[in-house]
């Protein structure tokens, strides 16, 4: 199904918990800055995902908080697995990944994205308020070993991390990971000074790239291949290409369909309808009707 701007709905991002075992100073909590209602159960999440398939969803992204804190995560993955779904992936901080990688693979998870903004143990501990970078590296190694690939490393480009980019690129090249360079969205005024313009970084990568591809169903974003390393950029701020080609809807952990990453004023309650046994297709239609590009071309 397309929205009124001609954008197909292909991807569904599920935030399954607000809880996390790290306290990164920049966390935007999937656009939900305060804890709200009741956590969705595994069965409720599965019902909602199954209903989404009718509207063209073919890719599922699971996130949090930290999704590995939910002990029923393998059950969720196993039960949403469907012949119509081409890809089920997970975004994690990687702290618990070594422990759960095999279980996730066995349940039907296809691949993982792991957040890693620095290779400096001291800086990592500071950014995450106590995290152990060695646990993350071991988790990445285990994920690759069990076949949760292609693994992506999510690098958040900020004033305090950008100097780490060359080392991160070398690391990703060495382990065979894809590098995703993400523009920082400051959700609080006091964090604005950490934002940097990633366009010059992308231009520099583009100059050195051996190959360039366009990902049609991922906001028309470019993929660059440079000395064997695949690099992608995620630039949501003031980006008409990102918004104009968005194919994703979201589910909050407390059961609201979220038409737009950058808005929190047009959520559609689907938790209560699913708990009441209603046909929830009309709520997906409402969500899709609410979709409009946050940044529009002039």
Swiss-Prot record:
<feature type="binding site">
    <location>
        <position position="152"/>
    </location>
    <ligand>
        <name>GTP</name>
    </ligand>
</feature>
<keyword id="KW-0408">Iron</keyword>
<comment type="function">
    <text>Catalyzes the cyclization of GTP to (8S)-3',8-cyclo-7,8-dihydroguanosine 5'-triphosphate.</text>
</comment>
<feature type="binding site">
    <location>
        <position position="61"/>
    </location>
    <ligand>
        <name>GTP</name>
    </ligand>
</feature>
<feature type="binding site">
    <location>
        <begin position="248"/>
        <end position="250"/>
    </location>
    <ligand>
        <name>GTP</name>
    </ligand>
</feature>
<feature type="binding site">
    <location>
        <position position="13"/>
    </location>
    <ligand>
        <name>GTP</name>
    </ligand>
</feature>
<feature type="domain" description="Radical SAM core">
    <location>
        <begin position="4"/>
        <end position="227"/>
    </location>
</feature>
<dbReference type="Pfam" id="PF06463">
    <property type="entry name" value="Mob_synth_C"/>
</dbReference>
<feature type="binding site">
    <location>
        <position position="26"/>
    </location>
    <ligand>
        <name>S-adenosyl-L-methionine</name>
    </ligand>
</feature>
<feature type="binding site">
    <location>
        <position position="260"/>
    </location>
    <ligand>
        <name>[4Fe-4S] cluster 2</name>
    </ligand>
</feature>
<dbReference type="GO" id="GO:0005525">
    <property type="term" value="F:GTP binding"/>
</dbReference>
<feature type="binding site">
    <location>
        <position position="246"/>
    </location>
    <ligand>
        <name>[4Fe-4S] cluster 2</name>
    </ligand>
</feature>
<feature type="binding site">
    <location>
        <position position="91"/>
    </location>
    <ligand>
        <name>GTP</name>
    </ligand>
</feature>
<keyword id="KW-0949">S-adenosyl-L-methionine</keyword>
<dbReference type="GO" id="GO:1904047">
    <property type="term" value="F:S-adenosyl-L-methionine binding"/>
</dbReference>
<comment type="similarity">
    <text>Belongs to the radical SAM superfamily. MoaA family.</text>
</comment>
<dbReference type="InterPro" id="IPR013785">
    <property type="entry name" value="Aldolase_TIM"/>
</dbReference>
<dbReference type="Pfam" id="PF04055">
    <property type="entry name" value="Radical_SAM"/>
</dbReference>
<dbReference type="Pfam" id="PF13353">
    <property type="entry name" value="Fer4_12"/>
</dbReference>
<protein>
    <recommendedName>
        <fullName>Probable GTP 3',8-cyclase</fullName>
        <ecNumber>4.1.99.22</ecNumber>
    </recommendedName>
</protein>
<feature type="binding site">
    <location>
        <position position="65"/>
    </location>
    <ligand>
        <name>S-adenosyl-L-methionine</name>
    </ligand>
</feature>
<dbReference type="InterPro" id="IPR010505">
    <property type="entry name" value="MoaA_twitch"/>
</dbReference>
<dbReference type="GO" id="GO:0061798">
    <property type="term" value="F:GTP 3',8'-cyclase activity"/>
</dbReference>
<feature type="binding site">
    <location>
        <position position="27"/>
    </location>
    <ligand>
        <name>[4Fe-4S] cluster 1</name>
    </ligand>
</feature>
<dbReference type="InterPro" id="IPR006638">
    <property type="entry name" value="Elp3/MiaA/NifB-like_rSAM"/>
</dbReference>
<feature type="binding site">
    <location>
        <position position="20"/>
    </location>
    <ligand>
        <name>[4Fe-4S] cluster 1</name>
    </ligand>
</feature>
<keyword id="KW-0547">Nucleotide-binding</keyword>
<keyword id="KW-0411">Iron-sulfur</keyword>
<keyword id="KW-0501">Molybdenum cofactor biosynthesis</keyword>
<keyword id="KW-0479">Metal-binding</keyword>
<feature type="binding site">
    <location>
        <position position="115"/>
    </location>
    <ligand>
        <name>S-adenosyl-L-methionine</name>
    </ligand>
</feature>
<comment type="pathway">
    <text>Cofactor biosynthesis; molybdopterin biosynthesis.</text>
</comment>
<dbReference type="InterPro" id="IPR007197">
    <property type="entry name" value="rSAM"/>
</dbReference>
<dbReference type="InterPro" id="IPR050105">
    <property type="entry name" value="MoCo_biosynth_MoaA/MoaC"/>
</dbReference>
<feature type="binding site">
    <location>
        <position position="243"/>
    </location>
    <ligand>
        <name>[4Fe-4S] cluster 2</name>
    </ligand>
</feature>
<keyword id="KW-0342">GTP-binding</keyword>
<feature type="binding site">
    <location>
        <position position="24"/>
    </location>
    <ligand>
        <name>[4Fe-4S] cluster 1</name>
    </ligand>
</feature>
<dbReference type="GO" id="GO:0051539">
    <property type="term" value="F:4 iron, 4 sulfur cluster binding"/>
</dbReference>
<dbReference type="GO" id="GO:0046872">
    <property type="term" value="F:metal ion binding"/>
</dbReference>
<keyword id="KW-0456">Lyase</keyword>
<dbReference type="GO" id="GO:0061799">
    <property type="term" value="F:cyclic pyranopterin monophosphate synthase activity"/>
</dbReference>
<keyword id="KW-0004">4Fe-4S</keyword>
